[in-house]
Amino acid sequence: MFASGRLQTLCYKAEIEAALRTPGFAGLQLLDLHDFPGQGSALVGVLDAFWEEKGYVSPEEYNTFCNQTVPLIRFPKMVWLNNEILNVPLEVAHFGERPLQKANITWNISDQNGKKLAEGNFVKDLPVTNCIPVGNIGCALSGINQPTQLTVSVEIKEANNKNRWNIWVYPVKQTTIEKLPYIASSLDNQAMNRLNKGENVLLLLQLGSILPEKGGNISVGFSSIFWNTAWTNKQPPHTLGILCDPKHPALAAFPTERYSDYQWWDLMSRCNAMVLDDFPADYRPVVHLIDDWFTNRKLGILFEGKIGNGKLMVCSIDLQNDLDKRPAARQFRQSILQYMASDQFNPSVTLDPEKVRALYKK
């Protein structure tokens, strides 16, 4: 629940901030703050059906983006390259009891270790309205040479509120990998021969190749399920984000938490789910896709194992097309390849090749 709840919180933050950035905005109304137990159960709330916290978002965090005074940023994108300059407009929505005179607005950009890359401040009168322009903030990204998650924070001291956003910066020039695996689109004779010889194989399953009963009929999307799939007659999406171990070495060059954030948006938008219920009961994919709570299948979009004398990585994300326009997909592929070229690539589970083949159309 924590991982799907964090995605739900991210989606609520995006919706509410979009409303607050809208000219002529006159207020917002959410469907509910708590889960609705009727009509097949709608798990739409950040509180449960008894109005109790679920444990994935606190009132304090929710207030950072849903409050009478909220700092806002108009990001053109959330994934950047290190040959770009981050330059984004900062604004404020203020609907307090009275205007704020000479409000002190501070901002900073920091990495995951807390090191500040840039900071600054503005002094601004805040009338009771929204779309109040404050100024542009940002910094050059050329000093970032490794895949990095940054946090952009803005605080209005007089309003006692601080909002923040995660962004990602990836290097334009990637590390050369000398020991590339054999890349295949099916577990054919050539791929099996290489595995039997002890080689590494990366199986990139093409979009649309997964059989319907093995996940091809599951509509994957970045956002969460609305209401429930039973009541909406399988309205897409059918999933609730990803769950992974951020410390897994396959993700070492793709900074992430254990749940979805915006660096996963492109990947989730161009992937197929794989149903892994026929795999061992205790088997866990590298990147788990959280299923609809009515079906609760074991879904994956990246998994690994041993076959014969070799090692196999299977991915159902599109990591081959338009990579020059898809920096997150390009970096995710790089992270997988670096892992497969290292001594850390040593899966503990032996897979049945027929169960792998059973996932996709022949």
Predicted regions and their residues:
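Substrate-binding clefts and catalytic carboxylate motifs of secreted carbohydrate-active enzymes
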Residues: M1-K102, Y283-P285
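Soluble or luminal CAZymes and related metallo-dependent hydrolases
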Residues: A3-C11, W293-T295, A328-F332
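Flexible loop/turn segments at secondary-structure boundaries
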Residues: D35-S41, K116, Q190, S209-P212, ...
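Beta-strand-rich binding/interaction modules
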Residues: N83-D125, I132-A140, T148-K157
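Short, exposed coil/turn segments at beta-strand boundaries within extracellular/luminal domains
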Residues: E158-R164
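Low-complexity, Pro/Ser/Thr- and charge-rich linker/hinge segments at domain boundaries
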Residues: W165-S186
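Short alpha-beta junction capping motif
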Residues: K179-N228, K306-N309, C315, I336-Y339
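Catalytic beta-strand/loop cores that center a nucleophilic Ser/Cys/Thr
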Residues: S209-L211, N228-P327, Q344-K362
